[in-house]
């Protein structure tokens, strides 16, 4: 149901996630294979039969004025708040056009999303929802600065300076990070869906269109193809997408901001999809030679085709290029870090030891994003994470509801020196993104993983023997269960290849991460 609430122009407006959105001047028709094929099943539309539970006194509070734009189910207007004269945007949705239950669900979901994100500085502010016998009214902040797309096109060469681009990208990443903490994936990040609050050059950017957005349960994936062709991530086309797809889209936008061209282009949508799946962005053409290495590194790490190796929104906010001029307090807790902390307790003892060894080989520059995450969780800034701070951090990943006993179990697994606290070294071992380390710098991965291996391989013969494993871990009793997990060829010892495989893959006991008990079904 997303509508761009611009007092200048409305592009890509749509009242239904199941319908095509209006074409924009710089993008092909957004795709949505969820389009319903059901026939109308009754003389009274579902919308007319539904009480949405919203207030019934819209006209007592607002006077509708100038038309801004329209979608499939209704129109968007400027309206005046009667008590104080404030100008707002009102989307008026026609109940008679909500024929099927899915259309009603879409309206309710959009309101739910706007309420969930209410208060975020880079999301259009939700004021209220009303209804009467004929319409649903969604009242929001009015943005009068125009679309991000229009500002791009107004720039010389259709591109931003690096400094200005970083400011814009930082705001989009903050929106994505906030969405992901709420168990929400935007699914249609593109310049047309961001508006400026005002025409001022330093106006804040606002995300306005959540028409394709959806809640997702932890560990689950979307299996449909939605979004806009130029910005769609490879995993969306493979029908296995999640929050990572939003970061890919922001990577595409960043590429456009910096050079004025799309990274993946063809004359047809099928051609675009093939480009997305097969090719890498071109950094050899003008003006990339004049763009900083830091900016190029940032874009490349967002446009990694493997979603496991792609930066998360929170990690991207820690990157030197986008962080310059920003504050550490802008960086939200990273859902992938929280997931890694939850998973660490499920890993075998051997994998926990291996990850600790790998973490000890990394320098500060390689784990700067994890330093930001540690500092965000360490509320009292005493250099360690307490049980209460761990509980507060894990609670920020809203779809999960962990019992205190489970939080204590997680902290105990991470706390290798058993002092009841998690220091930074222990935190890195549990929070590390191994796939990213391998993808972003394969040579460094080879060196780091070998160095970790050699912490076990005391005689440097190229294998970890049972006795070396026992000496490193300090474990008593049979070492066979640990050895068996990594010893793929069953020769009674662990090679470097087998050790790297252990680092890359979750242990056998944790390959199926369960959805949290008591997960709130937000749909």
Curated annotation (Swiss-Prot):
Residues annotated to bind Ca(2+) 4: 487, 489, 491, 493, 498
Annotated knockout phenotype: Severe growth defect in shoot elongation. Severe growth defect of flowering stem.
Pfam entry (one): Pkinase
Predominant location category: membrane
GO function term, MF aspect, one: protein serine/threonine phosphatase activity
Residues covered by region (Autoinhibitory domain): 328-358
Activation and inhibition: Activated by calcium. Autophosphorylation plays an important role in the regulation of the kinase activity.
GO CC annotation: plasma membrane
Positions contributing to ATP binding: 68-76, 91
GO BP field: defense response; negative regulation of defense response to bacterium; protein phosphorylation; regulation of secondary shoot formation
Protein name (Swiss-Prot/TrEMBL): Calcium-dependent protein kinase 28
Organism: Arabidopsis thaliana
């Amino acid at each position: 149901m997303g509508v761009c609430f611009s007092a200048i122009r409305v592009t890509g407006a749509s009242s239904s996630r199941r319908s095509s959105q209006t074409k924009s001047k710089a993008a092909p028709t957004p795709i949505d294979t969820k389009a319903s094929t059901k026939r109308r099943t009754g003389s009274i539309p579902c919308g007319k039969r539904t009480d949405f539970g919203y207030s019934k006194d819209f006209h007592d509070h607002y006077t509708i004025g100038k038309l801004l734009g329209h979608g499939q189910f209704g129109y968007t207007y400027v309206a005046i708040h009667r008590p104080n004269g404030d100008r707002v945007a009102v989307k008026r949705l026609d109940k008679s056009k909500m024929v099927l239950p899915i259309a009603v669900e879409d309206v309710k979901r959009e309101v739910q999303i706007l309420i969930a994100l209410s208060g975020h500085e880079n999301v259009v502010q939700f004021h209220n929802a009303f209804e009467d016998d004929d319409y649903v009214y969604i009242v929001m902040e009015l943005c009068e600065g125009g679309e991000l797309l229009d500002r791009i096109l107004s720039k010389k060469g259709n591109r931003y300076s690096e400094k200005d681009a970083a400011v814009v990208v930082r705001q989009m990443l903050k929106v994505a990070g906030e969405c992901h903490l709420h168990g929400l994936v935007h699914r249609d990040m593109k310049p047309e869906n961001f508006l400026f609050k005002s025409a001022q050059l330093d106006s804040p950017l606002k995300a306005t269109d959540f028409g394709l957005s959806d809640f997702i349960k932890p560990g689950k994936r979307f299996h449909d193809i939605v979004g806009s062709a130029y910005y769609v991530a490879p995993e969306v086309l493979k029908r296995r997408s999640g929050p990572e797809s939003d970061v890919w889209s922001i990577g595409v936008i960043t590429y456009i901001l910096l050079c004025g061209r799309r990274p993946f282009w063809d004359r047809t949508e099928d051609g675009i999809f093939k480009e997305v799946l097969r090719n890498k962005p071109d950094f050899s053409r003008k003006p990339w030679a004049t763009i900083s290495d830091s900016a190029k590194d940032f874009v490349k790490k967002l446009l990694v085709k493997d979603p496991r190796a792609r930066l998360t929104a929170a990690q991207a906010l820690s990157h030197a290029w986008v962080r310059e001029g920003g504050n550490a307090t802008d960086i939200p807790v990273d859902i992938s870090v929280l997931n890694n902390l939850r998973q660490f307790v499920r890993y075998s003892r051997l994998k926990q030891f291996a990850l600790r060894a790998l973490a000890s080989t990394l320098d500060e520059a390689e784990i700067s994003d994890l330093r930001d995450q540690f500092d965000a969780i360490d509320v009292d800034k005493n250099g360690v994470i307490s049980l209460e701070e761990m509980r507060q951090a894990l609670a920020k990943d809203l779809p999960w509801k962990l019992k205190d006993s489970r939080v204590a179990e997680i902290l105990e697994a991470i706390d290798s020196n058993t002092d009841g606290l998690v220091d930074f070294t222990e935190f890195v071992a549990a929070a590390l993104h191994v796939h990213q380390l391998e993808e972003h710098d394969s040579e460094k991965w080879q060196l780091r993983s070998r160095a970790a291996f050699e912490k076990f391989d005391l005689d440097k013969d190229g294998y970890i023997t049972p006795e070396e494993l026992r000496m490193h871990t300090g474990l008593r009793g049979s070492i066979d269960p640990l050895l068996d997990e990594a010893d793929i060829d069953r020769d009674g010892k662990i090679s470097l290849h087998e050790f790297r495989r252990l680092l890359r893959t979750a242990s056998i006991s944790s390959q199926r991460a369960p959805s949290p008990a008591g997960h709130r079904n937000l749909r």
